[in-house]
Design a protein with these regions (language model features):
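Catalytic active-site module of serine/aspartate enzymes centered on a nucleophile-bearing elbow/loop
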Residues: 103-122
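Short, well-ordered secondary-structure micro-motifs
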Residues: 11-14, 73-74, 102
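Catalytic histidine neighborhood in serine/cysteine hydrolases
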Residues: 80-100, 111
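Short alpha-helix in the alpha/beta-hydrolase fold that links the catalytic acid
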Residues: 49, 58, 72-81
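Histidine-centered divalent metal-coordination motifs
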Residues: 4, 64, 97
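Hydrolase active-site cap/lid region
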Residues: 3-45, 51-52, 91
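Acidic catalytic loop of the alpha/beta-hydrolase fold
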Residues: 66-71, 98-99
């Protein structure tokens, strides 16, 4: 199950800069990405859920709040489309970041339960 996940650190940083500063990222994101590469061994572009989900072979339930102000909901559609496994998508109207279960508990838990039941032998 993936909830409110970004496609990559690079995409998330771009979205945050756009929201906070109107989109002018200048050298900030590339500089921090380079610092990450030096210190941790990977750049923001390499820290990519999008690249990882393409290799996933297990079933994935994607859940995202449509009113997520932190991670744009559009990212879940890119992740869903990139997944080459059995998958299901649930977007929750009015739900902010990681609030899908709180905003629509019946919808959320029904989706989780039915998804899990598809893969559990009874």
């Amino acid at each position: 199950c993936i909830r409110d996940s970004y496609t990559s650190v690079w995409d998330q940083a771009k979205a945050a800069v756009k929201d906070l500063y109107g989109g002018a990222m200048g050298v900030f994101i590339p500089a921090v990405s380079l610092a990450s590469k030096v210190k941790f061994g990977y750049s923001f572009r390499e820290a990519s859920a999008l690249n990882q989900i393409r290799r996933c072979k297990i079933p994935v339930l994607f859940i995202h709040g449509e009113a997520d102000a932190l991670v744009p909901c559009a990212m879940v559609y890119r992740l869903y489309e990139a997944a080459n496994c059995d998958k299901q998508l649930l977007t929750v109207p009015g739900a902010g970041h990681c609030l899908s279960a709180s905003v629509a508990p019946k919808l959320y838990w029904s989706a989780v339960r039915s998804f899990i039941e598809r893969y559990i032998d009874r």
